[in-house]
């Protein structure tokens, strides 16, 4: 499957290029960077320090998408919406690992998915999606009157959105387990005099610092006992390989908006 990597000079863009070279089910077709990037016109090998790849870096989406079958996208919300539009028009698979979308932007992506196959997830790793599966089951088994749910995450100093897309994915799994809407029970932060904790609420707390790739814990706190389900990402390659697995899967599926739970066959297990 021929793929275009967008945001190719970012952390995940470089990881994706490296991962594609190591797989047989996908091949690198084009790499796209922001307008007037100093990388434009150079061989894509400069991004990963390898031998020549024979692919010139471009800042022109039309050029980047002209002969591709899919777009792999870890960029930012505004750019992802633009690429989703291209994908819908050209019937290209679109894999979205971007986070930080507003409700309106989420709705636009769902609309584009009527015309092409989109896989969108706050985290593309197998481990996190298995964790979400476990969180949903635990939330269903542990009643709100007996167990409080808190979600903690830490990322590197340069991450710009909070809570992370992964934390929200885990919060959504917990809310679904308890048959409630996350927006109705979500507590984003606590500061000053907050009063007692509301029964059934799902709290989020975030830390930023250093080069932490990603740490997430979901805490079920009851009387005299505490259950902690957690995941630590040690390399970004887990996200890249998950995204490429999603691309290969999406190629053979109908138009629609899917998640990594669909790709991994975990939705049926909830």
From Swiss-Prot:
GO terms for cellular component: cytosol. Belongs to the DapB family. It holds the Pfam family DapB_C. NCBIfam families: dapB (TIGR00036). One of its GO terms (molecular function) is oxidoreductase activity, acting on CH or CH2 groups, NAD or NADP as acceptor. The active site is at residues 155, 159. This is 4-hydroxy-tetrahydrodipicolinate reductase. (S)-2,3,4,5-tetrahydrodipicolinate binds at residues 156, 165-166. It is an enzyme of class 1 (oxidoreductase). Keywords: Amino-acid biosynthesis, Cytoplasm, Diaminopimelate biosynthesis, Lysine biosynthesis, NAD, NADP, Oxidoreductase. Catalyzes the conversion of 4-hydroxy-tetrahydrodipicolinate (HTPA) to tetrahydrodipicolinate. InterPro entries: DapB_C, DapB_N, DapB_N_CS, DHDPR_bac, NAD(P)-bd_dom_sf. One of its GO terms (biological process) is diaminopimelate biosynthetic process. Its EC number is 1.17.1.8. The keyword Transferase does not apply. It is found in: Cytoplasm. NAD(+) binds at residues 7-12, 97-99, 121-124. The keyword NAD applies. NADP(+) binds at residue 34. It catalyses: (S)-2,3,4,5-tetrahydrodipicolinate + NAD(+) + H2O = (2S,4S)-4-hydroxy-2,3,4,5-tetrahydrodipicolinate + NADH + H(+); (S)-2,3,4,5-tetrahydrodipicolinate + NADP(+) + H2O = (2S,4S)-4-hydroxy-2,3,4,5-tetrahydrodipicolinate + NADPH + H(+). Pathway: Amino-acid biosynthesis; L-lysine biosynthesis via DAP pathway; (S)-tetrahydrodipicolinate from L-aspartate: step 4/4.
């Amino acid at each position: 499957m021929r793929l275009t990597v967008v945001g190719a000079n970012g952390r995940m863009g470089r990881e994706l290029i490296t991962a594609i070279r190591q797989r047989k089910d996908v091949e690198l077709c084009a790499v796209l960077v922001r307008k007037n990037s100093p990388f434009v016109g150079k061989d894509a090998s400069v991004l990963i320090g390898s031998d020549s790849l024979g692919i010139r870096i471009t800042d022109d989406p039309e050029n980047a998408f002209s002969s591709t079958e899919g777009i792999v996208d870890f960029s930012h919300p505004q750019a992802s919406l633009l690429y989703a539009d291209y994908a819908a028009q050209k019937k290209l698979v679109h894999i979205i690992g971007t986070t930080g979308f507003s409700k309106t932007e989420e709705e636009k992506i769902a609309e584009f998915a009527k015309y092409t196959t989109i896989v969108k997830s706050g985290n593309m790793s197998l481990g996190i999606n298995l964790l979400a599966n476990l969180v949903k089951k635990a939330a269903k088994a542990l009643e709100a009157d007996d167990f409080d749910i808190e979600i903690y995450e830490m990322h590197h100093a340069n991450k710009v959105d909070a809570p992370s897309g992964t934390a929200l994915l885990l919060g959504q799994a917990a809310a679904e387990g308890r048959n409630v809407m996350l927006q109705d029970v979500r507590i984003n932060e606590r500061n000053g005099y907050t009063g007692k904790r509301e029964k059934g609420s799902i709290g989020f707390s975030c830390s930023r610092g250093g080069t932490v790739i990603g740490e997430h814990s979901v805490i079920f706190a009851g009387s005299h006992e505490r259950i902690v389900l957690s995941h630590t990402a040690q390399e970004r390659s887990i996200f890249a390989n998950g995204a490429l697995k999603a691309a290969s899967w999406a190629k053979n599926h109908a138009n629609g908006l899917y998640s990594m739970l669909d790709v991994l066959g975990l939705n049926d297990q909830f």
